[in-house]
Amino acid sequence: MNNQSVRKEYYSNDIIDEAADYLSTITDSPKLESEILLADILKTDRLDFYKRNLSIDHLSYKKYRSLLSERQKGKPLAYLTGKKEFWSLVLQVNEAVLIPRPETELLVEKCLSFIKKCNNSNVLELGTGSGAVSIALAKENPLIRFTAIDISTKAIEIAKKNAVNHHVNNILFKTSDWFSEVNEGFNIIVSNPPYVDKDELTQDEIMKLYYEPDIALYSKDSGQSAINHIIKNSQAYLRENGLLLIEHAYNQKDFCQNELELNGYVDIKTYDDLNQLPRVTIGKKI
């Protein structure tokens, strides 16, 4: 943005328009993001900007310029505001956790449908991150017991805060390298593991993911290593007729289905996300 140090007064309409121009090269929604960032600083709703032209104090304006500069460098909006909406829940996020994606709501949707069919379900989530999936599930099923694990202690701290913020108390959070600290059986195991093949990405795509934790994004062996590990080891932790639900890349459908079949799973099905791309594959233990 141009140097505005000589300006005595700042008004929301003007600086949002300036900010939108400034962010137009980094995002497809520059005005929306400009409004969200200013609303976050002012602790107001962005719709207020359409009701009146707000006067902005100099300190708030300086904070705004600082956030805009970070956004222009590629830092995700969710990390700048410290929050992200998922399944109609506003979750705390920082650079220790993956930013929840809309595609992952399919994992929640399918898991909820199976929970309703199971009496006394006991659910394990592998790689909980911000806690998005487990909290969304537990919020709608307060009488069911959930266990959510992650290898990152910082991620578990964020997940616990999110659970408290949403008054969810039926999740046991544990630090664990996949199944290493798991010692019981479950009716359902659900996971959105790292599945991105870094070698397939362009430099621009890598830079867009730069601020998010590599451990939550990338997996070896063409992005298949974590999925393979989960499928091969999950049978030992599933009860009879238990279900394994895994999110994966659109081009990993055949791999997931084949691995599930090789490891004794039946009734294997894959579901498409909102973009009509294969996203979640489910198998049943017999």
Q: What is the meaning of each model-derived region?
A:
Residues 39-113:
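Conserved AdoMet
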Residues 2-64:
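A short N-terminal interaction module
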Residues 78, 196-199, 251:
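Active-site beta-alpha loop architecture of Rossmann-like, nucleotide-cofactor-dependent enzymes
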